[in-house]
């Protein structure tokens, strides 16, 4: 039996992962549940983990996987948004993931979630991505994340991010940004006037601000694949 707050938090995490492909940050959870501090979120997360509804991924800051949903909340079906690789036996109460149609997406190399690295434009391999994550239409590619600047957005070093190709993005979108035509980075984009801010999701990294003509959007985040 879950409390109302526990159910509300679980539902919020589930909806955000369905929409964005990554878990919300603790600040976003706190705001969504109208709590005064993140300590309340920590207590709710711990309670959900103890009851087997979620799992916090070891050695990955604030990375959360939904293991199951309450029966009353699964009328439309439920599948975890984090795609698991080889990791040994699953917990006894873990739900089996149903096979879903998938599409091969090219992995274009590595992208920095930290200090920008040289832009990558060659296909390194391919990865199978559920069509549900890709949606209808559009071109997609994938990149391996290097660095920890986006950990508070649930994006960790070694994750594979799935990107919808395009040169436009809304304020607050997580994008692949090409800086001065030679460095690529994964950051949250903010526009103000003729300037663009590339925000990290880790307080250890500073926000970098550029003129509009120094940054080109190469695509926006639509999902995430994690193996561990």
UniProtKB/Swiss-Prot annotation:
Its EC number is 3.4.21.88. The record marks 113-114 as: Cleavage. It holds the Pfam family LexA_DNA_bind. The keyword DNA-binding applies. SUPFAM superfamilies: LexA/Signal peptidase (SSF51306), Winged helix' DNA-binding domain (SSF46785). It comes from the Bacteria. The active site is at residues 149, 187. It catalyses: Hydrolysis of Ala-|-Gly bond in repressor LexA. Keywords: Autocatalytic cleavage, DNA damage, DNA repair, DNA replication, DNA-binding, Hydrolase, Repressor, SOS response, Transcription, Transcription regulation. It is an enzyme of class 3 (hydrolase). Residues 26-46 bind DNA. Homodimer. Represses a number of genes involved in the response to DNA damage (SOS response), including recA and lexA. In the presence of single-stranded DNA, RecA interacts with LexA causing an autocatalytic cleavage which disrupts the DNA-binding part of LexA, leading to derepression of the SOS regulon and eventually DNA repair. Belongs to the peptidase S24 family. This is LexA repressor. It comes from Jannaschia sp. (strain CCS1).
């Amino acid at each position: 039996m879950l409390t109302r707050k526990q159910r509300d938090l679980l539902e919020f995490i589930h909806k955000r992962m369905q929409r964005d492909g990554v878990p919300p940050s603790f600040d976003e959870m706190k705001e969504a549940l109208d709590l005064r501090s993140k300590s309340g979120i920590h207590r709710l997360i711990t309670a959900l983990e103890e009851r087997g509804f979620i799992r916090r991924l070891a050695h990955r800051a604030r990375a959360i996987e939904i293991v199951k949903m309450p029966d009353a909340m699964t009328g439309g079906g439920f599948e975890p948004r984090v795609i698991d690789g080889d990791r040994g036996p699953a917990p006894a109460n873990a739900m089996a993931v149903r096979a879903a149609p998938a599409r091969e997406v090219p992995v274009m190399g590595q992208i920095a979630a930290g200090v920008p690295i040289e832009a990558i434009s060659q296909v390194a391999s391919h990865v199978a991505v559920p069509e549900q994550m890709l949606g209808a239409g559009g071109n997609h590619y994938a990149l391996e994340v290097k660095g920890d600047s986006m950990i508070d957005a649930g994006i960790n070093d070694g994750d594979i991010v799935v990107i919808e190709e395009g040169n436009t993005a809304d304020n607050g979108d997580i994008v692949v940004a090409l800086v001065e035509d030679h460095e690529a980075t994964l950051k949250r984009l903010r526009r103000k006037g003729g300037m663009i801010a590339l925000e990290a999701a880790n307080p250890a990294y500073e926000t970098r601000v550029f003129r509009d003509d120094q940054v080109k959007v190469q695509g926006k985040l639509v999902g995430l694949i994690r193996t561990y």
